Each structure stands twice: as structure tokens, then as C-alpha cells.
């Protein structure tokens, strides 16, 4: 009986210990949850204060005030210093937390009118409006990921030893996808716009349109260079001024639109962005390879025809300029990537000039 009683008392002690452990676990979980909520609140407040500081700096520039003392003179009580102190305190608390909070990208002022609407269709882009409205992302996850630079991802997850775990956090995979679709969309657009342009010319034109220079300019139209989230060290290294980094952000946004199920909207958006560039393209007529023969058969009995090199040193960039001479007078001159093409184009122009005013060049 005594043995049974001691055994029963042991079970009671064990049960009590388990209960205490469970209770401590719940308190710990509650503490962690509370800590996370508090961390989130610190983060949101920190973000709001940071925006306020940016606004105050902008106001300083507009009013030509350049020091914190100027602000404190305008607004009593060392306002700037107090705000800056609160910001640093909140940032310090946030950085000490183990569980990171991913920053949410702010909306560019030009895009605020789109936030309450559904994504625009091609019909919603107003004629002549440039830049076209930024198609909003529907996925909250993509909204965060698209502006998350890899440097910031490693900064908020410093103990992550497996880089693959961060692939869904930063925007490099989105940039890879967007780069492919930027090429595809541009190919579709110029293939349709320039039906008489050969493959080589189309390739050169596409290369001009899809390079980092174009993507960087498009990104800055929407303030992506300001919205991009970088690490502290990346900011110090001036990555925000890097053309490649900002261009990648544009491509990441394009990739995010694709994953968001908005491929047609993305195509219309790129089409509108490229519109001014396409409008400035002057397409030459296809080369008439029989132009020299036509000119010879029509005018050789009426005078002497010759072709002279007048400019250019060759190569696809510089090319050649060839003049068509009739009875010692220059009738036309034309450029070509090689001497044969330049001569053919000069003959094409000469046929038109002589047809209109032959008497000017007659013997």
C-alpha cells in the first residue's frame, strides 16, 4: 500500500511538472507573440517618423533652410532633435528583435490614384498619357518582394546559412523572369510595328530598347529608385545610384506582374512605355538590289554613271557613304553598312531625282 501511495504521489508530481511546463510554454509563446506585435508597432511607428523626417528635409530644401537649428527656430522646442531621437530609439529597438519584419514599399505619388481601383486594362491607359499608370500588384507578398534587394534580405536574416531560403524574399528571381518577358514583349512590339525590317535590324533595335539604360529610365518614372529597399552597407556603397540595380527593379516589377496573372496588362504597359522611342524610329525602305541595273539600263545611253566613296570607314556602326555621279554631277548620296548597300541606296535615290528633273543633269 505504501509503495502504491508513493507511486501515485510520483505520478502527481510528474503531472504537476508537465502542467507547469505547459503553462510556461504558453507564457513564453504569449511573450513571443506580444514581443512580435510590439516589434511590428515599433517598426510601423519608425517608418512613419522616417517619412516625417524626409518631408521635413524636403521642406528645408524648398524654403532654403539648411540646418536643424533653422527647423528648431521655426518650430519651438528642438522639434527636429526630438523626432530624430525618437526615430533612432525605435530603430534600435527594432534592430534588436530576433524576428525580422519586411519593409513594405511605399507608393509613388503618381500611382496613388490606382491603389483603390482594379488593375488597368489596355483601355484604361488614356491616349497621350505618359508615363502610363503603374499597374498595381494584387498580391501582398509580391508587393513586398519586388522592392526587396538581396542585400536587405541578408541584413534582416543575418543567420540564414542557406541562400535558397531567401529566394522568395528578395527580388532577383522576379528580375530574371521580368528580363525574359521584357525581351519577349519588345520583340512582339517591334516585329509588329516594323514589318519590313530584317532580322539583323530588329535585333539591333531590340538591344537598344531592352538595355539597362531604358529599364533604368522606366523605373525612375515611377520612383522605383526611391522605393527600393537596400541594406545599410548597400546604401553606403551608393547602390541606389547604380543604373543596373534600378533597371533590375523595373524588370522585377514586370516579373511580379506576370506571376500576379496580369500578363496582358504588363504587355500593354511595356507597349505604352516604348511608344515614344518607337515613334522616333525612322525606317529605311528595303534595299532594291536591282537599282544599279535599272539606273544603267535607263540612263547609260544618255550619260556616264559612276559611284564614288565620299565618307565612312566601314564597320556596322560607321558604314559607308557612296555618291552616285551622272555626267560629272552628284545626283544622290546614301549610307549603307557596306559599300554595296550604300551604292544600291544611292542608285535608288538617283532614279527618283532623275525622273523628276533629268534636264538638270543632261549633257
Curated annotation (Swiss-Prot):
- Record field: compositional bias (Basic residues): 24-35
pH dependence, record text? Optimum pH is 8.5. No activity at pH below 6.5 or above 9.5.
Pfam family for this entry, one: Ribonuclease_3
What Gene3D superfamilies has UniProt attached to this entry? 3.30.160.20, Ribonuclease III domain
Cofactor(s) recorded in Swiss-Prot or TrEMBL: Mg(2+)
- Nucleus: is it a keyword of this entry? no
Record-level GO cellular component terms: nucleolus; nucleoplasm; nucleus
Query: What GO terms are given for molecular function?
Result: double-stranded RNA binding; double-stranded RNA-specific ribonuclease activity; metal ion binding; rDNA binding; ribonuclease III activity; RNA stem-loop binding
Q: Which UniProt keywords apply?
A: Endonuclease, Hydrolase, Magnesium, Meiosis, Metal-binding, Nuclease, Phosphoprotein, RNA-binding
Q: Where are the stretches annotated Disordered?
A: 1-35, 92-138
Domain DRBM as annotated: residue spans: 285-356
Compositional bias annotation for Low complexity: 13-22
- Domain RNase III positions: 139-262
Mind telling me which InterPro entries this protein's record contains? dsRBD_dom (IPR014720), RNase_III_dom (IPR000999), RNase_III_sf (IPR036389), Rnt1/Pac1_DSRM_fungi (IPR044449)
Outcome (variant: residue 178 to D/S): In snm1-1 and ran1-114; loss of activity
Modified residue annotations for Phosphoserine: 122
For this protein, the Enzyme Commission number is 3.1.26.3
**Biological processes, Gene Ontology terms:** box C/D sno(s)RNA 5'-end processing; meiotic cell cycle; nuclear-transcribed mRNA catabolic process; RNA metabolic process; rRNA processing; termination of RNA polymerase II transcription; termination of RNA polymerase II transcription, exosome-dependent; U2 snRNA 3'-end processing
Q: Reaction(s) catalyzed by this protein?
A: Endonucleolytic cleavage to 5'-phosphomonoester
Q: What does this protein do?
A: Digests double-stranded RNA. Converts long double-stranded RNAs into short oligonucleotides, leaving 5'-phosphates on their cleavage products. Probably inhibits mating and meiosis by degrading a specific mRNA required for sexual development.
What is the official name of this protein in its record? Double-strand-specific pac1 ribonuclease
Species, as recorded: Schizosaccharomyces pombe (strain 972 / ATCC 24843)
The organism's taxonomy opens as:
Eukaryota, Fungi, Dikarya, Ascomycota, Taphrinomycotina
